[in-house]
């Protein structure tokens, strides 16, 4: 197998180089810890990692030494050499590497390949760069725990992450982005701005929304509800638990059980926390006999669901165990499907544009290995989604095998201010659940007619969307979403009455405003408001009282004196239009 770099494929070249960087790091670690046991070391989106079983716990202070040894290996210009051997020969070579032996046992071919560079060899398909000197721009970033093969019952290994790029300028740009991302981390900002809290006494992945975060969530939800009502959806509410038999009928118990919580016994029957809202909406639809003339019927719910996540993958608001989906299910005739998906795409684009996400990529995820239903219906559903994307002139990529067990789906991933992608709207066509629950309508001929179903979210979960929104704006939310929109700052005590009068006028317009009448200096009050990321500060003193004006300071530092009436008009316009500009 060739291991040459193909310069006509820069993305592939980058992946090859990153994989080679992982091997170089493994050799460096082995030079420090000769008794180390090796896991795996692949290339990933921004670099590489390698998993190690080591005699002691690594600390961040170890990374510079590992990096120094890597640089020495790079300067040595060592060749990467590919060899093929029998599995028996490989077992002898890796006799002291139990994880490699386990991987060898999983390989069905009798011949395997290894790669060597310097004093290091690894079980590997490759390809790699020709020489270590080709790995020119890398940086070790962090250490984390990782269970062997992702199984919590297996040993915990130590994973070292690194970044790697084709040139130092690209690496520097990425490291700057990481530095900015750390400042915007929603976990850090969530604490500083008092948006949410997590408590071990409650349990991992279960979120408390604090007043500031609750206001932002409320505003998002109110906007969501109004927009859905405007577009012909009916709002519904459903319980948080249901009998296990319901999930057996739906197929979730067979296909999704590992993500569900254990049943609880209630009056001798087994109940379980719901992982999804769809089955409840199906039963609502079946609540009475329906005519084909009533379709489409669109049910929307901000429904809280519970899914088991391993403790090691929980992450602030973006990976939790209990979350609220902006969920909806559309029941329609087969010939209405394409039109309904087109409408959902239009709604999804409108929603994410409103929140300031203008760049996104779209994936069409097709049938997975584990699925239910007939192949012809899968193909028909996939074709419907593709036609809807094309009708909206939305470019997309096919993501083979990434659909859900009951149908294909469209995934829209939007890009934030730092160029990172986040999971956004999802649209799924489903013929299987309606069949399992015998969902039908009375057709034009008086006979039962089958119904298709569209599952969709436009924001994802409220928790994950809030984490994304917080990092997109660095906690400095647009005025319409800010927990506090205005802080009025009287220069002296004698100006407090005027400040309160202005605040009262703003409250009558439902503006979220406070007066800072503390006995602090004006500069201290301004600084405090800026740290709280309040969009507007209105400083008032003798001149402002005399002219009925305000000295407006924005959180970005710009200043302007204007009549209070003009400021109020400007602010209300920004709130009404949901402007992302201050």
UniProtKB/Swiss-Prot annotation:
It comes from Dehalococcoides mccartyi (strain CBDB1). Belongs to the class-II aminoacyl-tRNA synthetase family. Residues 185-478 are annotated as: Catalytic. This is Threonine--tRNA ligase. Catalyzes the attachment of threonine to tRNA(Thr) in a two-step reaction: L-threonine is first activated by ATP to form Thr-AMP and then transferred to the acceptor end of tRNA(Thr). Also edits incorrectly charged L-seryl-tRNA(Thr). It is an enzyme of class 6 (ligase). GO terms for cellular component: cytoplasm. Homodimer.
